[in-house]
Amino acid sequence: MAGPLSVEDMLAKQKAEKEAAAKPKFLSKAERQKIALEKRQSEVREQQEREDAERRQREEFDRAAEEERRRHEQERYGYNAGPSGRNDRDGYGRDGYGRDNRRGFGDRRDGSGPAIPSGPRGAALPVGPRSMQSRNGGGLPYDGFAQGSPSQLSSTPVAGSASPGPASTTASGDAVPPSQAELEALRARYLGKRTDGKKPRLRKAQDKKIIFDWNEQDDTSAADQSSWTREVRELVPGGTMFGGRLAGMDGAKKNETRSDNHADPLERRRAVKGKDDDRHWSDKPLDEMKERDWRIFREDFSIAARGGGIPHPLRNWRESAIPSQILDIIEEIGYKEPSPIQRQAIPIGMQNRDLIGVAKTGSGKTAAFVIPMLDYIGHLPPLNDDNRHLGPYALIMAPTRELAQQIETETRRFALPLGYKCVSIVGGRSVEEQQFALRDGAEIIIATPGRLKDMVDKSILVMSQCRYVVMDEADRMVDLGFEVDLNFILDSMPATFVKPDDSVALQPTKEGEWQGWRVTTLFSATMPPAVERLARKYLIKPATVVIGNAGEAVDTVEQRVEFVHGDEKKKARLIEILRTIGLPPPIIVFVNQKKTADMVVKYVQQAGMSGVTLHSGKSQEQREAALQALRDGEISVLVATDLAGRGIDVPDVSLVINWQMSDTIEKYVHRIGRTGRAGKTGVAITFLTNDDDEVMYDLRIEVEKSKMSKMNPELARHEAARTRVTREMKRKRGDEEE
């Protein structure tokens, strides 16, 4: 016999049980299937029990309702339903008189007299819908009055009875049978026959002639139409009152007059005065274009311009004031039609006016400022040994090295055939190399603000004759902290070329040479307050051109939003997209940190595609090599930070994936603007988490604006997408939770 357990044994046993419970238990496939089957059986059993309980509850409720109904009928009508069935609805039992007995007449076939009705309501006959129905539940059939009545009533009809109603009584209290008219009225009402006394109903025919229900011989409107109707028809040239056509009236002319009566009176007067026609603006020569045609033209291309004295936009290249040499270069490059920003910005630039251009990303802004700039330089004396040391004629500033080099490539396509030299000054390259490139001078310099400020500050480069300044992506330069550098560079230029408020851009001198005032052009995708402050300081009476709605994504991008939580799920979803979406490379994946880019590029390689990274940790040579490999098709996927999100033009990008949502909606717009360029369509997929609540509201608005995009239901229902969440609100919420 075992002795009592000691405390040590009990503690050891408890410890062993805890360890066994803490260890994971690995189940085989058969055990997992068995557990799943048992769980499913229990769920089915519980569902059946719930349904049985609901059915029993419903049956009890129906039974109680039936009992309550019977009790209510008994209290209301004063009868008691026997076990064999219910009494008649009108209060008559099975053994008494039925519905027809209450009418006071007998069977039509045997001619017997009516019997005296019995029951609690024998003194008055019921009328209304209940008197037309019988629910005797198995009583006597409808065959007249019941036989064997205690007494017979007189069958003589009452004279003068004209309306159906209950049987009248004599002075002695005997019931008087209804008259024949009353019987006919009851029979017609019971059978649902129409009566002649019904109110006429108004209906309309197809020929717009009003037709009533009365007889045609009662129509007095057609009796004599030879007098007043003829006068009315003659007084109304647009048409006759009752249809038809007057002699000598042309139907086509009548319709023309009627449509003209519905036209806009202001437009009709303008058409008569100016002899406008209805031809589309594309079918008219340039000299026949009216102000209305130009207004329609601007609406077609979503062009809005203000500033006074705005020239007409370009319809095509050959109708512009661009020199023939530049037009030949445009044709050689392959620009068939101007983009909307080019249509309006180039005519303004050809007037040498200061310009503010606000347009979407990928809208062709580079050519919009390069073409007027080359025309401006063409009026200045060529560079030689006497003036090349004074610096360039034109300066183009961009926020990033990649964008500056891209602008340099595009500018060279126009400038080299004209004999102009372009030099880029960007960070990441040695100053000596760039100084050597400037030894022979250059008409055009493309630079980033940081490196250009250093070279100007060290007197390596001077701006003594710079007269044409372009700031591309000005909002991005301000965001990157280059506002102070921009002010320093612009202030270092000579004030002698600053345009007075009442001057024109170019003034011819006595010698016949052009002495140009400085022209400043600013292009941006958005207009934050810092950019507006910069424009007010350095631009003189600028013309402002807005294409579409500033700061919106392009209409050719399909935006998709997916809620994906955790890096592992993002990894699996990224690999699935790259393998199954079926879009050709190049593809760009945007991240927020450099280390994330190095991690994501490995996932791209796991998906079977070649990838490369682009961020600030790469040298200038590595960045250029990465972009060139992507353009040449050697690399399929580029993983980049927001460094490449502005202005980088990689042709034919079909897909943009936001591995992480940007912290502002402006950056998101510029990211997805890498695809859907040059009239092509693209797809942008964004991985969203609950931590992105600060931008969910703006993101929902952007997706709703896009006609190509479909709203994610989870995003539409999210609380942060319905109400804007600020950083201060999140901070207060975190303090309350702590």
From Swiss-Prot:
One GO term under biological process is: RNA splicing
Taking every annotated instance into account, which residue ranges of this chain make up the domain Helicase ATP-binding?
346-545
Protein localization: Cytoplasm; Nucleus
**Residues that, per the record, bind ATP:** A359, K360, T361, G362, S363, G364, K365, T366
Domain Helicase C-terminal residues, every copy: 556-719
**Compositionally biased tracts (Low complexity):** 154-173
Reaction(s) catalyzed by this protein?
ATP + H2O = ADP + phosphate + H(+)
**What EC number(s) does its UniProt record assign?**
3.6.4.13
**What name goes with this protein?**
Pre-mRNA-splicing ATP-dependent RNA helicase PRP28
The organism that produces this protein has a lineage beginning with: Eukaryota, Fungi, Dikarya, Basidiomycota, Agaricomycotina
**By which gene is this protein encoded?**
PRP28
